[in-house]
Design a protein with these regions (language model features):
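Non-catalytic terminal extensions that flank enzyme cores
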Residues: 34-132, 155, 417, 430, ...
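Secondary-structure capping and boundary motifs in well-ordered enzyme cores
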Residues: 115-121, 136, 140, 160, ...
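Residue patterns forming the tRNA-binding/recognition surfaces of aminoacyl-tRNA synthetases
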Residues: 58, 63, 71-72, 76-80, ...
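Catalytic adenosine-cofactor/nucleotide-binding cores of aminoacyl-tRNA synthetases and other
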Residues: 428-432, 624-628, 632-715, 820-825, ...
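C-terminal low-complexity, glycine/proline- and small-hydrophobic-enriched intrinsically disordered tails
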Residues: 676, 817-1008
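N-terminal catalytic cores of NTP/NDP-binding nucleotidyl/phosphoryl-transfer enzymes
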Residues: 108-172, 225, 234, 299-302, ...
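Alpha-helical recognition segments enriched in aromatics with Gly/Pro capping
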Residues: 345-346, 373-385, 496-499, 503-509, ...
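Acidic, turn-prone loop/beta-hairpin segments
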Residues: 162, 254, 258, 265-270, ...
Length: 1008
């Protein structure tokens, strides 16, 4: 009869199938489930035991199928609300020391000793679907959230979506047009209602994808930026800034998108280099008698269509060429309008002809010039960039059609002096790619400098050298400060219907504005009921910039309703991309510092800047590019769809790929081959689990039992334990220490490589194979040794699963639940404690000794590959021990190898190990630590063919090495090449040099 597995409640110890205290009872009573008190060492306070909702027991199938596993656990995590963080009870708020230098922004809670770790998800557009940038960002955030949760921190990761004003309105407008109507025909109210319906039906795509990919967010706190509670915060912020004199309305030059028909911010303009022209136009000079003198002042322009709105021509006061034209009047070509010549030192004498047309309504520099000289502004284009009535005969023409027509007319009248080629940067709308038009428009602005001053102070060190906010990598801190130091007032109004409508009402009687928190019924100035609300909406970034305060209850922070704010604000960390550093990050810092600063601390004292910031740290992640480091775009056809890759390889493999490549400050060259490799890694772990379960079953059948009390905590060994046990424990402690340190430093790549190296390299490739030698179920005399080996195997495997869990949550969850036969002590491995190391448990001698064995085994394996030995073939090897000694291996190389002969023979697939004074003639050899090793293979080697192959390889390696050395020796190359290119070339050089040395050695060893 097969003995059933044992289930028991204890996060710290695996409920492995058979243990000391009940194997005989279990054999008689297959349905009995025993319970054992867990070791508190690995239990987080928030962890709870299994429940009736726990999945039914199941064995690990032979084949690893990530899709089936991931669908199941993704649904389970959401259904069980495993990652929910409830509002703290009154009085259980956290204490703050306000220092961003504290590791990962962690803070201790007085009530339970837990440290809040709070992340705000950068809200994706409600119109969006997951792309590789999202998955990369979510992977990093989720690793950190799961890691902190397993460190028993109070983790809150808040999800949500942005209403995305322009993008959403454009999408719904296209749908409306396809139905044969327009938003204008529908009217504002009906159109906005249509957008809300669209959002209800299609707006949750990306969040659904996040759920499928296992993001450990608190779904109960999901927000939408136009939710009622957030809308209240938006209106309060606008009104408060207006009351403080920091919001004003005025006519200024803005970036106008003719396609979106709205103003857009400087950050929403993308500049591309284009080859254009510089048109030189003759402006007739008017004499004192009001008649043309026959002289012309030639003006250079890149936009001749805007000349219809010229109000002056400016020259430098010290330009001797034009001294005689001071105070003269000119006749504006094609319009017959008279305009003055003005003097301004802003004019560059070296550009064009040194005379510039002044068009205040269509150029920001000209607008400033017009303000200085009290010039009028003539707007000659409408919202669609067509010439308006001010353009006379050109009215109704598209701007570029008008340009062509104007140039033709100028030439026909002899007023076109010349055309020169000219390269210029042209701004495009980042959403619709339409060329942006600088346009004079009545807009709402935030007087930004007072807010910026606080945001700058938050990032700069204070008198004690501490920063309220740390930006990492540090180069982005400099970029942030430079941008903030040159910031301009923020245009916050958008000519859209979808968004937060500006809470301002104009009066038809007194013509003043009423700004109010609640919709007014009459003018606040004259009492008239003839008031009309502003039609514009607020910039999307205004509402999203308030999220760190608004999601935690601001502005309604009262004594009864402040637990969330006091516990979770400031948040700990923001993980985001460089592309929204100024769009979003800077604005959150400005608005957060400004508004949170007015919220008293829990004890009633004034909130200092360090407690007003929206987050303690900002981690700027890299961009995900294709395998050739090209930016992904639909145009290039190189876009990688993460959902499709996940379907093929599994979420865990894609997550681990992204984590392994996440080096701070270096863009990721996503390569599907890496994902294939990590899919194999996941399969390796799966097979290791099946091997362990199989051997636990076998052991139980002969009454070999494992004491559950030893499981769960970090394993320890005595000095008399076998080498492999002392070594694997040392490696485990060292790996755990380094992984924790790497995650504290946001080195996801280093942490991933450490885990891979340990789990695949140390545990699976070496330790598991050595343990097979110790598991002897047939010899009663070896029962104690078998039990010890099996116990250590299970201990190390359990810790390894917890170590890997934040990176591969689905795989580890499945194996963990299977270990417990579907009745685990907690609902998830994510609620267990993350491994913690003890440096005193690292046996450096054992590590050094295993390096010797690993070196011999790896060199032997390489030799087998070189001479074509079949993978499963067992053949003799020769070992020539050198004179070198090492403290790790005691008396010498040969005695050490003889002591561990069984390990060498098994892992090197050697039928025997022959110790010789000299490697036999004709054998290929490799240097292995303190000696040489050769493989004796009774197969005919075609020596001439092998010599020819090696000669070609040597020539190839020499050529490649010379090329790499030439590039690395070039100062010009080193100065201009990106760091990742230089590092890659150095790595390539080292690898090529090693291959060359091995090929030369192999050639020299050939007989004849």
């Amino acid at each position: 009869m097969r003995v059933p597995r044992l289930s028991w409640c204890g996060i710290s110890s695996f409920g492995f199938r058979h243990f000391d205290f009940g194997a005989r009872i279990l054999a008689r009573a297959p349905l009995l489930k025993l319970k054992v008190v867990p070791s508190v060492e690995t239990v987080c306070p928030s962890a709870s035991g299994g429940s009736s909702t726990t999945p039914m027991p199941h064995d690990l199938p032979k084949a690893y199928d990530p899709t089936a596993i991931e669908d199941h656990w993704a649904e389970y995590w959401v259904r069980e609300n495993l990652f929910a963080q409830p509002t703290p009870k009154p009085g259980s708020t956290s204490t703050h020391d306000g220092s961003a230098s504290e590791a990962s922004g962690r803070r201790k809670s007085e009530s339970d000793g837990q440290s809040p770790f709070v992340i705000l998800l950068p809200p994706p557009n409600v119109t969006g679907s997951l792309h590789m940038g999202h998955m990369f960002e979510h992977t990093e955030s989720d690793i950190l959230a799961r890691w902190h949760r397993m460190r028993c921190d109070r983790v809150l990761w808040v999800p949500g979506t942005d209403h995305a004003g322009i993008a959403t309105q454009m999408l719904v407008e296209r749908q409306v047009v396809s139905e044969g109507t327009t938003r204008q025909k529908m009217g504002r109210e009906a159109f906005v209602e249509r957008v809300w319906k669209w959002r209800e039906h299609y707006g949750g795509t990306i969040l659904g994808q996040m759920k499928r990919l296992g993001a450990s967010v608190d779904w109960q706190r999901e927000y939408f930026t136009m939710d009622e509670r957030l809308s209240v915060a938006v209106r309060e912020a606008f009104v408060k800034l207006h009351e403080q004199g920091l919001i004003y309305r005025g006519a200024y030059i803005v970036n106008w998108c003719p396609r979106c028909q709205t103003a857009i911010s400087d950050l929403e303009v993308v500049y591309d280099e284009h080859k254009g022209h510089l048109w030189e136009i003759r402006y007739p000079v008017i004499g004192d008698d009001g008649k043309d003198t026959g002289e012309f002042l030639t003006v250079a322009t890149t936009r001749p269509e805007t000349m219809l709105g010229d109000v002056a021509v400016a020259i430098h006061p010290d330009d001797d060429r034009y001294t005689h034209l001071h105070a003269k009047m000119l006749r504006l070509p094609l319009t017959n309008r008279e305009i003055p010549v003005i003097l301004d030192e802003w004019v560059s004498r070296d550009f064009g002809t040194g005379a510039v047309k002044v068009t205040p309504a269509h150029d920001p520099n000209d607008f400033a010039l017009g303000q200085r000289h009290n010039l009028p502004s003539i707007n000659v284009m409408d919202e669609t960039a067509h010439i308006n009535a001010e353009g006379g005969a050109y009215a109704g023409l598209d701007r570029f059609v008008a340009r062509k027509k104007i140039v033709e007319d100028l030439e026909a009248q002899g007023l076109l002096a010349g055309i020169k080629d000219h390269t210029l940067n042209i701004g495009h709308c980042s959403r619709c790619k339409t060329i942006v038009e600088p346009r004079l428009s009545l807009q709402w602005f935030v007087k930004i400098q007072p807010l910026a001053d606080k945001a700058i102070a938050a990032v700069r060190p204070d008198a004690e050298g501490k920063k309220a906010i740390r930006i990492f990598p540090e180069q982005y801190e400099k970029v942030y400060l430079e941008w903030m130091g040159n910031i301009h007032d923020w245009c916050i109004s958008r000519q859209l219907w979808w968004g937060h409508r500006i809470p301002a009402w104009s009066c038809a009687v007194c013509h003043k504005m009423t700004v109010a928190r609640e919709d007014p019924s009459q003018c606040a100035h004259c009492g008239s009921e003839k008031i009309t609300q502003e039609t514009d909406v607020l910039d999307t970034w205004f509402s999203s910039g308030l999220l760190p305060v608004s999601v935690f209850g601001w502005p309604n922070i009262t004594a009864e309703n402040r637990a969330d704010f006091d516990t979770f604000y400031p948040t700990s960390l923001l993980v985001t991309g460089f592309d929204i550093l100024f769009f979003w990050v800077a604005r959150m810092i400005m608005l957060g510092c400004w508004f949170a600063g007015d919220v008293p601390m829990p004890d009633g004292t004034k909130r200092e800047l360090k407690e007003s910031v929206p987050f303690r740290e900002v981690y700027i992640h890299a961009l995900v590019r294709d395998a050739n480091r090209e930016k992904m775009s639909k145009t290039k056809g190189n876009v990688v769809d993460p959902i499709e890759i996940v379907k093929q390889y599994g979420t865990d493999a894609v997550r681990f790929t992204l984590a392994s490549m996440a080096s701070p400050g270096t863009d990721i060259a996503f390569n599907i081959a890496r994902t294939e490799g990590y899919r194999a890694f996941a399969n390796k772990i799966w097979n290791a689990a099946r091997f362990i379960f199989m051997n636990v079953d076998r052991a139980a059948e002969i009454d070999i039992k494992v004491d559950p009390a030893v499981l769960g905590a970090m394993p320890t060994v005595g000095a008399d334990a076998p080498l492999e046990a002392r070594w694997i424990v040392a490696e485990l402690h060292a790996t755990v220490a380094n992984v924790n340190k790497s995650l504290e430093d946001y080195r996801f790549d280093v942490a991933a490589h450490l885990i891979e190296k340990f789990f695949w390299g140390d545990f699976c490739s070496y330790y598991l194979e050595i343990v097979k030698l110790r598991l002897d179920f047939s010899d009663p005399a070896k029962k104690t040794a078998t039990r010890a080996a099996l116990t250590m195997l299970i201990q190390v495997f359990e810790v390894s699963l917890r170590l890997l869990s934040p990176f591969m949550p689905f795989l580890t969850e499945e194996i963990w639940h299977t270990v417990y036969d579907g009745n685990p002590p907690a609902k998830s491995i994510a609620l267990t404690q993350y491994p913690q190391s003890d440096n005193s448990k690292i046996d450096h001698g054992a590590r050094g000794a295993m390096i010797v064995l690993e070196n011999l085994i790896s060199e032997t394996r390489a030799l087998r590959k070189d001479i074509g030995v079949e993978e499963n073939a067992v053949v003799p090897i020769e070992v020539c021990a050198g004179p070198g000694l090492n403290a790790s291996i005691g008396g010498g190389y040969e005695p050490f190898l003889r002591e561990n002969l069984a390990i060498v023979e098994r892992l090197a697939r050697a039928s025997e190990v022959r110790f010789v004074q000299q490697i036999s003639a004709g054998l290929l050899r490799r240097h292995a630590y303190a000696g040489d090793v050769a493989v004796i293979y009774e197969a005919t080697i075609d020596v001439p063919a092998e010599r020819e192959r090696l000669t070609k390889d040597i020539a190839k390696y020499e050529k490649g090495l010379a090329s790499a050395e030439r590039q690395l020796g070039s100062e010009g190359f080193l100065a201009k090449a990106p760091l990742h290119i230089v590092d890659g070339l150095k790595k390539q050089e080292a690898e090529t040099r090693l291959l060359l040395e091995k090929a030369r050695a192999a050639l020299a060893a050939l007989p004849g």
